[in-house]
């Protein structure tokens, strides 16, 4: 994984800021969601300047972690980030935290968050409902799980840890602009194919999804016993059941003394064009 980096200088001190990984991007959204939930649960609590500074320090600490000595000294990334966050809060001025936070946002492509399944606003619609941090986090996490499933990666956290934030955003953009567009095209052409073929083949079991390349219909379940009995009522020879499934219909006199194999051969040969044909 190659992360974008940029030197950040403040008051003569230079550090290296890195683009966040996709996993860090999700963890940052999780922090914002927790803060929003705490604010909703306590009507008297508001998002203060202290919260903004701590959120910025957390974001900067995650960025510094990629090139910080604590990365190899601490057993886990979360513990190392906590140590770096305390270092930022105690040694950095608030102005530097704010500027560095903006750099990390820019490097990671996190100025705009995409929410899955966001309803389109029409001209007659009222003011758009504000997108909460919880909705953004849920949308991003849902997409991350879908992406892991598409890539065959059962551990979605490991997948995101090895992916940059901009790479994750590129996948998000690709699926939003191409994959879902392909789904709409597939629906259109499968429906068109179904309409055309239904004019020539009056098959009640035919379905538009039979012609879909992206969403194949699952195999039909085994027919029930009564359906099998109804189909068996039309067989010539062998054990034959009536439509009610109870009464056994005896074989016709002309084939009563013949074996089952002979009767089956006669049945099949009725449709042969040319050669020996039986009535």
UniProtKB/Swiss-Prot annotation:
* Membrane as UniProt keyword: no
**Superkingdom assignment:** Viruses
Q: Which UniProt keywords apply?
A: Host cytoplasm, Late protein, Viral release from host cell, Viral tail assembly
Single GO BP term = viral translational frameshifting
Report TM segments. Answer: none
Q: Where in the cell is it found?
A: Host cytoplasm
Can you cite an annotated GO cellular component?
Answer: host cell cytoplasm
Pfam families linked: Phage_TAC_2, Phage_tail_T
Cross-referenced InterPro entries: Phage_tail_T (IPR009350), Tail_assembly_G (IPR010027), Tail_assembly_GT (IPR043704)
Instruction: Return the NCBIfam families for the record.
Output: phage_lam_T, phage_lambda_G
**Reported function:** Promotes tail assembly by creating a scaffold for the tail tube proteins. Tail assembly proteins G and GT probably wrap the linear tape measure protein to create a tail assembly scaffold. This allows the polymerization of the tail tube protein, during which G and GT are released, therefore they are absent in the mature virion. The tail assembly protein GT is produced by a rare -1 ribosomal frameshift. The ratio of translated G/GT is about 20, and this ratio is important for proper tail assembly.
Quaternary structure, per UniProt, is: Interacts (via C-terminus) with tail tube protein. Interacts (via N-terminus) with the tail assembly protein G and the tape measure protein.
Classification via HAMAP family:
GT_LAMBD
Family membership, please give it: Belongs to the lambda-like tail assembly protein family.
* Name under which the protein is recorded: Tail assembly protein GT
Encoding gene (name) = T
């Amino acid at each position: 994984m190659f992360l974008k980096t940029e030197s950040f200088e403040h008051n003569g001190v230079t550090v290296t800021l890195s683009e966040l990984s996709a996993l860090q991007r999700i963890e940052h959204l999780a922090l914002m969601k927790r803060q929003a939930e705490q604010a909703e649960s306590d009507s008297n609590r508001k998002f203060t300047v202290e919260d903004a500074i701590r959120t910025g320090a957390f974001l900067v600490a995650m960025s510094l972690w990629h090139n910080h000595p604590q990365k190899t000294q601490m057993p886990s990334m979360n513990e190392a980030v906590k140590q770096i966050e305390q270092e930022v809060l105690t040694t950095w001025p608030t102005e530097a935290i704010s500027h560095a936070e903006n750099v990390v946002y820019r490097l990671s492509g996190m100025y705009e968050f995409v929410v899955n399944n966001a309803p389109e606003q029409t001209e007659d619609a009222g003011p758009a409902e504000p997108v909460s941090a919880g909705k953004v986090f849920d949308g991003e996490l849902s997409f991350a799980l879908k992406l892991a499933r598409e890539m065959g990666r059962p551990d979605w956290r490991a997948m995101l840890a090895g992916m940059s934030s901009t790479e994750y955003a590129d996948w998000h953009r690709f699926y939003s602009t191409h994959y879902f567009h392909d789904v709409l095209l597939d629906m259109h052409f499968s429906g068109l194919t179904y309409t055309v073929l239904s004019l020539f083949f009056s098959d009640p079991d035919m379905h538009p999804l039979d012609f879909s390349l992206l969403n194949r219909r699952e195999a039909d379940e085994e027919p029930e016993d009564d359906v099998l009995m109804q189909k068996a009522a039309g067989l010539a020879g062998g054990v034959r059941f009536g439509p009610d499934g109870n009464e056994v219909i005896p074989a016709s006199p002309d084939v009563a003394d013949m074996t089952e194999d002979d009767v089956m051969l006669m049945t099949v040969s009725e449709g042969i064009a040319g050669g020996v044909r039986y009535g």
